[in-house]
Amino acid sequence: MSNTYQIYLISDSTGETLDRVFLAIKAQFKNIKYDVKSYFFTRTENQVSKIMDEAKKNDNAIILYTIVDTSLAKFLANKGDEKKIPCFSVLGNLIMNFSKLLNQKASHVPSGQHALNEEYYERIEAIQFTMAHDDGNLVEDVDKADLILLGVSRTSKTPTSIYLANRGYKTLNIPLVNEQSIPESLKKNPKLSCVVGLTTEPQRLVDIRKNRMNALKEKENTNYTNINKIEKEINEAKKTFIKYKWPTIDVTRKSVEETAASIIKIYEINKNNG
């Protein structure tokens, strides 16, 4: 029997939810070898049967699935029992338990989370706004932003902004060269929007900037990567954040998701105190 597990991901939609769940699972079992096969938009018994026949040919087959159509999900589970293949429904019990708790039947419509509702359009609008207001562009629109991120170069402003946009927040980010980088309207009214300063450890920033220069195949800019210059940049940025009473997040050992979660908490606090 092979020591490599054959993981089959079966979804009746885009598979986004399933991918995220499996990512979390495999992080817990780092020494396990596995191959992954993904089957998305699986919505018929014929499709399921073909996948199960394929899985049966492999040793150590495991199936994870997100299928909201109860009859199709039951068909898959029965096929798994028949062929002695372990099958795990990622959403089944969760939807059933929520249905009981809320005393309401679930719609069981695939891709329900992608319905073109008001929230969907708000997210699209947030993404468009954020892309147009990246890296100091259109800073005169600070009053239209839900969030404003400030920080010296390479403090994850852009990826964090894009992540926040996908969560529905119109985000504008500004590279902080000095205090003059900040729009006058924001200096006059620091609470005009929810402003968050991003900072990091100097040596970490040196490494990131050097990697950036290498990736672009550019000659090293001594001012851009000099530790003393960077320490001064960061200290000046911190002074600016303190002056205008803007909360600060150190992104040194944080993922984009962790940084964004902290920013959203700040936003919610500001909103509640608003």
From Swiss-Prot:
- Keyword Hydrolase in annotation: no
Q: What Enzyme Commission number(s) appear in the record?
A: 2.7.11.32, 2.7.4.27
Keywords for this protein: Kinase, Nucleotide-binding, Serine/threonine-protein kinase, Transferase
Q: Does the keyword Nucleotide-binding apply?
A: yes
InterPro entries in the cross-refs: Kinase-pyrophosphorylase, PPDK_reg
Q: What class of enzyme is it?
A: transferase
Its Gene Ontology molecular function terms?
ADP binding; ATP binding; phosphotransferase activity, phosphate group as acceptor; protein serine/threonine kinase activity
* Superkingdom of the organism of origin: Bacteria
**What is catalysed by this protein?**
N(tele)-phospho-L-histidyl/L-threonyl-[pyruvate, phosphate dikinase] + ADP = N(tele)-phospho-L-histidyl/O-phospho-L-threonyl-[pyruvate, phosphate dikinase] + AMP + H(+); N(tele)-phospho-L-histidyl/O-phospho-L-threonyl-[pyruvate, phosphate dikinase] + phosphate + H(+) = N(tele)-phospho-L-histidyl/L-threonyl-[pyruvate, phosphate dikinase] + diphosphate
* Amino-acid positions noted as binding ADP in the UniProt annotation, renumbered to this chain: G151, V152, S153, R154, T155, S156, K157, T158
Family listed: Belongs to the pyruvate, phosphate/water dikinase regulatory protein family. PDRP subfamily.
**HAMAP family linked to this entry:** PDRP
Report the NCBIfam families cross-referenced here: PRK05339.1
Q: What does this protein do?
A: Bifunctional serine/threonine kinase and phosphorylase involved in the regulation of the pyruvate, phosphate dikinase (PPDK) by catalyzing its phosphorylation/dephosphorylation.
Q: What is this protein called?
A: Putative pyruvate, phosphate dikinase regulatory protein
Q: Which organism is it from?
A: Pelagibacter ubique (strain HTCC1062)
